[in-house]
Each structure stands twice: as C-alpha cells, then as structure tokens.
C-alpha cells in the first residue's frame, strides 16, 4: 500500500455506461480535502467510444455528441493519478468507483493501492434514524447542496461536503465514545475506520454538556420541559398559530368535538378521510382544562409514530405541549441487554455495525423507542436480544436511566399521552385504573374490536392438544365427556393431516 496521508481525502465520483463488469467511464469528478478543507477539484468527460443508452443519457444529461469530442482516458490518466495516489480514496459506494478507476489506471501503467473510505457505510453508522442512504436523500436530510445529481463533479463535491459533515459530527462526540466506536470499526468496509481514527487522535478529552456516561454508554440528558403556552378557545386561531391553513370541514368537525367535550358524555363522531381530524379533536381537547390529561389511542404503531413526528412536533414547538408516546415494553431498548451484547465478540459484520449505530443513537434519543432507528427490519434476528421485557432488576446497571421505566414515569405526568389500540387493551387488562381521570379519545374506534379479538385469542399446538386429549381419555369415565374428547381428538388429527397434505402438494408443485 502506498504511503497515503490520512489527513488528505480524495473524493471521487465516476459516471459510467452501466454498473456492470463492462462499464466504461464517461465522466470523472475529483475533490481533494486536506486538513478539513477542500483545496482542489477536477472534472472531465471521458470518451467511451460507444453510444449511451437512453437511461444513462436521461440520468446524467450527457449526449453522444458531447462525449465524442471528450478526451481519451489515457490523455487524463496521469493527472487523475497524481490527484489520487497519496490520499485516502473516498466515494459514495466506494467499491464501484475505486475498482473501476483502478482498472482504468492499471491499463495505463498506474497502480492504485490507496486506502478506501465508503461514505455510505459511515453515514449508516452516524445517522441511524435515516431510512435511505443514497446521496440525494442524505443531501436533502442534511441540507447539503447538490446542484446536478449524477454529474460526476457535482456528486463528488456533495460527497466531500458529506464527509466533512460527518467528521464534524464525530468531533462533537466524547473521546470515550470514539474509542468504543474505533474498537468496532474494523468491521466497516475497507478502511472506513480511518475517518474515526483521525478524529479520535485529534479529539480532546472534553465532555459534552448534553451527554452523560453510564458504564461506557453515553446517553442524552433529559431535556428540560418548557413552560406550556395556553391555547386559544378559538380553533381557527390555534390553526393559524400552527402555521396551517384553515379548512371549513375541519372547523365544523372541531366545533362538533368541542360541543361533545363540554357535555362530558361518552360520544361517537364520524369524520371523512382527509379533513384533518387529528387536529380537529386534539386542539379542542387541549384548549380545555383537564387535570388528568388526555389519552389518545390510534389503531397502529405506524400512525402513532406518524402523529408524533407531524402533529406532535408542531404542538411541542408551538404550544410547548408535553406529549408522550407510550408503547409496549418490547418496543424499547433494554440498556442492560445492549451492554452485554456490546461487549460480546461477533463474527457478523452487520451486527457489529448495528452496535455502532445504536451507540450513536443513544446520544440522540430521549425515549429509547427502537422504531426511531431506520431500516430496523434488517436486524430482526438481532432485536429480540435487545428489547425490554417490562422487568427491571434491582441489580440493573442502568436502573436510573431505564427507557421503559422512564416511559412509564412520563406517561403519568404528560399532558397528552398517545398510544395504540393493541397496547391500550393489554394495559387495561392488567391495570383497569390506567384511564382514570383522563379524557380518552379513541381514534378509529371501529378498529378497537380487532385489538380486542386479538387479545381474546389463544394459540395451541395441535400435537400437544392431541396428546392432552389422549391422556384425559385414559382417566375419563363419563361417557359424554369421552365422546367430546374423542371428537376433539378426531378434529385435531384431521387438521394435522390436512396441513401436511397441503405441504406435500406445495412441495410437489414447486418441483
């Protein structure tokens, strides 16, 4: 490997005729970063000597006519090699760009053996809440300028800004956390760990005012509650304060809700889709004095998360409403479990990267709700080891900061408590007084029946049921009871036979 400087990053983006083995370079963009600043950049078209397909033309804006007068790669290879040879090669999906450029340079007599950093991999670690990590989405989320997507130099400039953005975020982390990340970073693609290593070497020992350390984990301090602002009795004024447009049907719905709330009776009200019913019932409820607070239940966790992100955020920002989302314990990270897993050696690279993501997420979350982590579906085989079971041992290392316990405490004091039907019916079965002294609003109440049906259901293994029936028959003397047991046993065996027949039929059909 060449003697590459880890304080010199060479960010490269290539546009090519395809992403396959026969890909030919049609455009090169290079941005050089030294000591945290962009010091040089270079861009050029490359003549591929073959026509572009319509998809590539549309994607890049390049034409056959433009590339026909572009230089050969051999004419610019020396210039490109001088730029990239003694720095760390950086790209968004570095495998494609580095391998293709190395191949082109090799045929011109240059050997590219620089370390590689993948900004996709690094972004996945540092921004665990994101759902997607393509360059356009990252630039949009982080406010990075990307003037001409899929233009090599523009993409390289955006990737360089992204790298600087991520370095800045790393510098804001405590040195102890950087050390923990660095111990896991060998599992990142190629030499992506070098970015963390450089920041670690330059980072001071100063601690962050927003974080606190517990047994090597860095957790965000609880934010101070702001003094709530009083809502107007006028629905339209509240809508205006939220910077939303007034809608006649929504106003009519809100007035009806307000009238029903004043009557203090159990009431049902139907509203058509799309009129803005969430604000239509929340604002009238919040504008009324209520000692016990408001409990809102919605049909799904997806809708619960959506309301927290949209309506909940606006209400917090505008009126400083203390709103809390409450779910079952299995939705929260149990810090004791993660602590054990963190210190366990892993052979699975993705599992180790997920540990790094969680370490970053812990510095940002106040709830410990795992739904905040994007792409959580990719780690479903890992999650059961980490989730809370609703129990907290007195020997817990994190008893004072346990997310599930914190959620329960907040639920008691929050002005507006948001939950879902499944959790509500389960909670009421164990704690009937949960709704006492609260104004309860059931959104899409007709779907509460589904939650109640699911709660009432029990599951049995048919084989176990047959065994139990046979044991009962050995001792049962009553003739009617024996006939009932025999009938149940017959039906269970029939269902088992049908199941295996279907499996055999499916297998034969697949063959």
What are these regions (language model features)?
Residues 227-268:
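Conserved pre-motif I regulatory segment
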Residues 3, 165-235:
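Acidic two-metal-ion nuclease catalytic site recognized across multiple nuclease folds
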């Amino acid at each position: 490997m060449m003697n590459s400087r880890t304080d010199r990053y060479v960010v490269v983006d290539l546009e090519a005729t395809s992403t396959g083995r026969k890909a030919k370079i049609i455009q090169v963009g290079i941005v050089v970063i030294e000591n945290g600043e962009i010091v040089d950049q270079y861009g050029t078209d490359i003549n591929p000597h073959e026509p572009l397909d319509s998809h590539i033309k549309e994607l890049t804006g390049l034409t056959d006519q433009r590339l026909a007068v572009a230089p050969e790669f051999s004419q610019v290879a020396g210039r490109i090699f001088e730029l990239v040879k003694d720095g760390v090669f950086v790209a968004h999906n570095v495998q494609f760009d580095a391998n293709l450029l190395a191949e082109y340079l090799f045929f011109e007599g240059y050997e590219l053996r620089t370390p590689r950093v993948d900004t996709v991999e690094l972004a996945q670690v540092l921004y665990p809440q994101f759902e997607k990590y393509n360059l356009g989405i990252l630039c949009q989320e982080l406010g990075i300028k990307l003037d001409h997507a899929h233009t090599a130099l523009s993409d390289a400039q955006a990737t360089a800004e992204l790298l600087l953005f991520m370095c800045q975020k790393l510098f804001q982390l405590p040195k102890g956390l950087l050390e923990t990340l660095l111990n896991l970073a060998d599992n990142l693609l190629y030499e992506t760990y070098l970015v963390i290593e450089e920041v670690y070497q330059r980072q001071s020992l100063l601690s962050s005012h927003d974080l606190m350390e517990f047994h090597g984990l860095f957790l965000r301090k609880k934010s101070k509650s702001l003094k709530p602002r009083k809502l107007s009795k006028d629905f339209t004024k509240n809508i205006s304060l939220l910077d939303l447009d007034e809608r006649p049907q929504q106003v009519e719905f809100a007035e009806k809700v307000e009238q029903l709330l004043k009557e203090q009776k159990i009431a049902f009200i139907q509203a058509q889709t799309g009129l803005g019913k969430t604000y239509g019932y929340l604002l009238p409820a919040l504008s009324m004095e209520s000692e016990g607070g408001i409990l809102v239940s919605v049909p799904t966790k997806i809708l619960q998360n959506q309301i927290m992100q949209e309506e909940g955020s606006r209400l917090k920002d505008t009126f400083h409403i203390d709103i809390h989302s409450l779910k079952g314990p299995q939705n929260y990270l149990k810090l004791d479990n993660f602590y054990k897993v963190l210190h366990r050696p892993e052979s699975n690279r993705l599992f180790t990267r997920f540990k790094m993501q969680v370490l970053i997420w812990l510095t940002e979350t106040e709830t410990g709700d795992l739904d905040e982590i994007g792409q959580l579906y990719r780690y479903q085989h890992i999650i059961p080891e980490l989730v809370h079971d609703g129990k907290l041992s007195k020997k817990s290392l994190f008893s004072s900061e346990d997310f599930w316990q914190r959620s329960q405490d907040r639920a008691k004091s929050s002005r507006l408590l948001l939950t879902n039907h499944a959790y509500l019916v389960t909670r009421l079965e164990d704690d009937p007084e949960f709704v006492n002294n609260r104004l309860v609003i059931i959104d899409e109440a007709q779907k509460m029946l589904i939650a109640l049906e699911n709660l009432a259901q029990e599951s049995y293994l048919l084989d176990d049921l047959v065994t139990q029936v046979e044991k009962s028959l050995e001792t049962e003397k009553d003739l009617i009871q024996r006939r009932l047991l025999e009938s149940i046993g017959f039906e269970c065996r029939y269902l088992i036979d049908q199941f295996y027949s279907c499996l055999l039929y499916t297998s034969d059909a697949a063959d």
